[in-house]
Amino acid sequence: MRRQDREIVDPAQICGILKRSKVCFLSLCDGNTPYTVPMNFGFTEEAGRITLYLHSARSGRKLELIRKNPNVCAAFGTMLSFEDGETGCKATAQYESAVGFGTAEILSDLKACEKGLSCLLSQYESRAAHDFSVLLDRTAVIRVVLDRITGKTNRKETV
């Protein structure tokens, strides 16, 4: 990373960025062409390893690409504020972001799918229990285990 003074490698800080993010931009490989999809997500962290959970319809381009090549990139970001400058060169943004690389898997085990959907919903709401039985026949759950992830920030204070 060029601006090492802005790099974040601490797992707790990276998890904070993910918690504050509302969208995961999942990038897939379509031959030599990248394909990026904005998605809802949830995540877990154990011993510094982050696992993402995403959902999808049970068919479509995204799932076809994962089956062909499960290598993915996931990006997250939040613009905290924008500060005008007297000139364009003096304008700046307060932001935080994270980019991770890993492997995607389309889950087939119903318990794993329920866990993934529960994790996903916990990103956006506090209610603990859900009945996913009516969704599982038409919903695919994708698990992405990140091999590496780094963050970057330009903010005045840390959260």
Map each language-model feature to its residues.
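Structural motif corresponding to alpha-helix initiation and N-cap regions
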Residues: 11, 59-60
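Helix-adjacent hinge/juxtasegments
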Residues: 61-85, 91
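Extreme N-terminal tail/first-helix region
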Residues: 1-20
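Short N-terminal helix-initiation segments at or just after the protein's N-terminus
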Residues: 14-17, 36-51, 81-93
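Short, intrinsically disordered, mixed-charge
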Residues: 19, 59, 67-72, 118-126
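Broad gene-expression machinery/nucleic-acid interaction feature
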Residues: 23, 36-38, 71, 95, ...
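Charged, gly/pro-rich active-site loop segments
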Residues: 2-5, 79-159
